[in-house]
């Protein structure tokens, strides 16, 4: 009876949104286009669809909420796949695509009321996104310069003022 419990519904939606915003904040801080709003909306919409599926399953016994989860996973996979591209032999935006997928998982688990799972998973995801970036930098993995003459690329400013590779030719 989630529809009759406005407080529970609101908590689940807010939790999904806030945790999605936390994931998006990390991406936004590093200049990625899929940032705060995108991650917040993906988490919120996933929670809403999950809550709706649970309501339908409760009202109609022949309804299967797992199909909504499967549909969300496919839809987010399609959107995330659109973010990924290859330039100069390097694959770009894999982490942003994965964090969008995580934002959907946050919304699904928050919408389902799995509070321990959503909080633990979000905490681990934030550690992966922030702490491991520091480790990658120390290992030199993130030290490639876009204006390196050997890479054959140059940079130009993007809408946030940071630089992005510009195609040659």
Please annotate each region the language model reported.
Residues 74-78, 95-100:
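Hydrophobic alpha-helical membrane segments
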Residues 76, 125-134:
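Alpha-helical transmembrane segments and their membrane-interface exit regions
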Residues 60-84:
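Alpha-helical transmembrane-segment detector that highlights a single hydrophobic TM helix
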Residues 93-98, 116-121:
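Hydrophobic alpha-helical membrane segments of integral membrane proteins
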Residues 1-68, 112-120, 131-138, 153-169:
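Alpha-helical transmembrane segments and their membrane-interface boundaries
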Residues 97-98, 102-114:
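Interfacial segments of multi-pass membrane proteins
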Residues 139-148:
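Short, Lys/Arg-enriched, Gly/Pro-containing loop segments at transmembrane-helix junctions
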Residues 33-36, 65-66, 85-95:
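Short, amphipathic, aromatic/basic-enriched membrane-interface segments that mark the entry/exit
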